[in-house]
Amino acid sequence: WIMGHMVNAIGQIDEFVNLGANSIETDVSFDSSANPEYTYHGIPCECGRNCKKWENFNDFLKGLRSATTPGNSKYKEKLVLVVFDLKTGSLYDNQANDAGKKLAKNLLQHYWNNGNNGGRAYIVLSIPDLNHYPLIKGFTDTLKQEGHPELLGKLGYDFSGNDAIGDVAKAYKKAGVSGHVWQSDGITNCLLRGLTRVKEAVANRDSGNGYINKVYYWTVDKRATTRDALDAGVDGIMTNYPDVITDVLNEAAYKSKFRVATYEDNPWETFKK
């Protein structure tokens, strides 16, 4: 999965997919009542990027729905996975469940079109704080209460705080999650980060009894780092330059080992060599 980083304006969806992304990451900010408000990152963000592009969250969802609904004039067949980077740092811990409920209602209405031929992309809820694990239950309970448990099949999870792998496992246990787990590891492109924890996550994924199904590394903008991440066995790479990742995947060393995921590839299934 080539994951376009910080895609917060509707116009950027096309831009990143056209460069080779089959997945995008979108920031979601919340208001003081735990309502998802904007797709907005703000300053500081990554080196070489405009941090200030934004939409109202529900407007972005409608644009995203158009881009991921077959038959729509804006449809992009390649776009199959969306990571919502949930900026829950502005919330109190006791608002996490509420944030999950409100997020679910927004997605149900504006993205999934209340289950009536809505967007088809798989969705990952990425949470920066392990203490905010109740967000997951708030979200999943709401889908069930609203009569759409089938949409849980489209839903995956990520804790993005680079916490110890064992602590992340405990948070999922509390949240009642087993499966559909992506594990992120990374740091802003302005700084360097080694691959120690990525390798640990990959080992957990491949152990047969770990909690991780997929591992992605962020934010990778250079060819050398892309090669290192692929050599470590990641499933996804988040990038500001999808064309760079595409180029490396076309190199002789990687062409036979990796391919770009399509809609038919289940993002919740651990890949067995």
Curated annotation (Swiss-Prot):
Protein's UniProt keywords contain Secreted: yes
Catalytic reaction equation(s): an N-(acyl)-sphingosylphosphocholine = an N-(acyl)-sphingosyl-1,3-cyclic phosphate + choline; an N-(acyl)-sphingosylphosphoethanolamine = an N-(acyl)-sphingosyl-1,3-cyclic phosphate + ethanolamine; a 1-acyl-sn-glycero-3-phosphocholine = a 1-acyl-sn-glycero-2,3-cyclic phosphate + choline; a 1-acyl-sn-glycero-3-phosphoethanolamine = a 1-acyl-sn-glycero-2,3-cyclic phosphate + ethanolamine
One Pfam family of this chain: GDPD_2
Subcellular location: Secreted
Tissue expression as described in the entry: Expressed by the venom gland.
Tagged with keyword Repressor: no
Binding annotation for Mg(2+): 25, 27, 85
One GO CC term, this protein: extracellular region
Coiled coil: none
Listed GO biological process terms: killing of cells of another organism; lipid catabolic process
Role according to the record: Dermonecrotic toxins cleave the phosphodiester linkage between the phosphate and headgroup of certain phospholipids (sphingolipid and lysolipid substrates), forming an alcohol (often choline) and a cyclic phosphate. This toxin acts on sphingomyelin (SM). It may also act on ceramide phosphoethanolamine (CPE), lysophosphatidylcholine (LPC) and lysophosphatidylethanolamine (LPE), but not on lysophosphatidylserine (LPS), and lysophosphatidylglycerol (LPG). It acts by transphosphatidylation, releasing exclusively cyclic phosphate products as second products.
Family membership: Belongs to the arthropod phospholipase D family. Class II subfamily.
Name of the protein described by the UniProt record: Dermonecrotic toxin LhSicTox-alphaIA1iv
Taxonomic source organism: Loxosceles hirsuta (Recluse spider)
